[in-house]
Amino acid sequence: MGTNKPVVIGIAGGSGSGKTSVTKAIFDHFKGHSILILEQDYYYKDQSHLPMEERLKTNYDHPLAFDNDLLIEHLQQLLAYKQVDKPVYDYTLHTRSEEIIPVEPKDVIILEGILILEDPRLCELMDIKLFVDTDADLRILRRMQRDIKERGRTMDSVIDQYVNVVRPMHNQFIEPSKKFADIIIPEGGQNHVAIDSMVTKIATILEQKVNL
């Protein structure tokens, strides 16, 4: 493990943009190396104090839904090579689970989430900021597939949420945050040229750390 500060790579983009695919492609290339993924999705605010009817009204695409204070605290601890206990969010109960996931510090941290570029405090902690930019029609199709398959949602509920919440929030918060990115990746996980470029960049960073 290097003695200097870990490198933080931020990967942002709208829901269904392919940012998770980009993250996984980069991470899989470096399996066995000193690299970790920290997902903003795990840092939704605890809502255990609220009744279920209130939790169901949560707008998960709004910046205020995230506990960025805790995310920043954990990121700062990882930057100091300290272990953190990552929270787990229960989407069926719409609140934070009692489960935690211990995360060991690594030399390269991939921070992934829809709104990580929206918070200037998070941007300040990133060395490289990426925005995965994908056509809106493709994003909604991917979101429908995910929510129906993985979260037990109906097609009607997914479409209603997209029209009334996801699309407005994307236009208001996520799309404007694109201007803070150092690199914009069109077509998400299908953009092998961009992914290969990032792999080369990270490989250089890891090699420099080994030679310290």
Curated annotation (Swiss-Prot):
CDD domains: UMPK (cd02023). Belongs to the uridine kinase family. This is Uridine kinase. The keyword ATP-binding applies. ATP binds at G13, G14, S15, G16, S17, G18, K19, T20. Its main location: cytoplasm. Gene3D superfamilies: P-loop containing nucleotide triphosphate hydrolases (3.40.50.300). Pathway: Pyrimidine metabolism; CTP biosynthesis via salvage pathway; CTP from cytidine: step 1/3; Pyrimidine metabolism; UMP biosynthesis via salvage pathway; UMP from uridine: step 1/1. One of its GO terms (biological process) is CTP salvage. Pfam families: PRK. Keywords: ATP-binding, Cytoplasm, Kinase, Nucleotide-binding, Transferase. InterPro entries: P-loop_NTPase, PRK/URK, Uridine_kinase, Uridine_kinase-like. GO terms for molecular function: ATP binding; cytidine kinase activity; uridine kinase activity. The keyword Cytoplasm applies. It comes from Bacillus anthracis. One of its GO terms (cellular component) is cytoplasm. It is found in: Cytoplasm. It catalyses: uridine + ATP = UMP + ADP + H(+); cytidine + ATP = CMP + ADP + H(+). Its EC number is 2.7.1.48.
